[in-house]
A protein has these predicted regions:
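Kelch-like beta-propeller repeat domains
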Residues: 1-267
Length: 267
């Protein structure tokens, strides 16, 4: 299914963008010629419209969605300041709500929902570019943050992508592209354990160019073009409840572009 084209200016087209699927909306967050811009695709109307801006516009965020709510944590503002600000987006009302700030400012973190709580994991907290090893847990009921040591699977240094994380059946997994390993987070021992290999095609540029997501009870990895001779993307999946990692190719498509953004809707 091809979506309609977005009616944006050149500034937005060439800016860094974030994408997030929440409810029946797809949000694309970037910068247009006049400042921060958000465009919203509605699955119900098959059309794009301009969305309301964040209360504190930011980029390079950690984000995740659950049902009709998405949470966006940290990031950087237009001046490059690393933020601890957090906001939620409600797809039913199309509005933003400011939430309590994180314990630490962080950019290029990864966000997930697990066991009904939101987690911001890894990222960079200051201009020295040293990656954070901790994560933070946000309880939606108490509206409080808790720091969790050593929750990042590693990586996330200068020039690298945020940690590649996925939640399936309320278990947390990570793709270690440098070692080509699949890891699982032990909630009991609070540590990462290698459980298998990634698909051999899962090559990346310091983590960029690969999408790693949870979709219901399965883990999905989307691999972009490897070189000029192989101009296509492939989608692999694995269902943890069915045994050790055995990746199945579930789709592929010819493409001439690098994979920049990925969002999964309806899992």
């Amino acid at each position: 299914m091809n979506l309609p084209m977005m009616d944006t200016d050149l500034g937005f087209q060439f800016s860094d963008k974030e994408s997030m699927a929440v409810g029946t909306d797809l949000l694309v967050i970037g910068n247009d010629m006049l400042g921060p811009g958000i465009y919203k695709y509605s699955l119900l109307t098959n059309s794009w419209s301009q969305g309301l801006p964040m209360n504190e516009p930011r980029w390079l965020l950690g984000s995740a969605s659950f049902k009709n709510i998405a949470i966006f944590a940290g990031g950087v503002d237009r001046n490059g300041k690393i933020m601890d600000a957090v906001e939620s987006y409600d797809s039913e009302t199309g509005t933003w709500k400011t939430l309590p700030s994180m314990i630490k400012p962080r950019k290029l973190s990864s966000g997930v929902f697990m066991d009904g709580k939101f987690y911001a994991i890894g990222g960079i907290s200051s201009n020295d570019s040293n990656p954070l090893t901790c994560g933070e847990e946000y309880d939606l009921d108490t509206q409080k943050w808790t720091e969790i040591p050593n929750m990042s699977p590693g990586g996330g240094g200068p020039g690298m992508a945020p940690p590649l994380l996925a939640v399936a059946s309320n278990e947390l997994y990570a793709a270690d592209c440098a070692a080509m390993e699949l890891k699982m987070y032990s909630k009991k021992n609070k540590e990462w354990v290698a459980i298998g290999r990634l698909p051999e095609i899962a090559h990346s540029r310091d983590g960029w160019g690969i999408a790693f997501r949870g979709c219901g009870n399965r883990v999905v990895i989307i691999c972009g073009p490897r070189d000029t001779q192989n101009r296509y993307i492939e989608i692999y999946s694995w269902v943890p409840s069915e045994g050790p990692p055995q990746w199945m190719r579930i789709g592929w498509k010819s493409i001439n572009n690098f994979v920049f953004n990925c969002a999964i809707m309806g899992c």
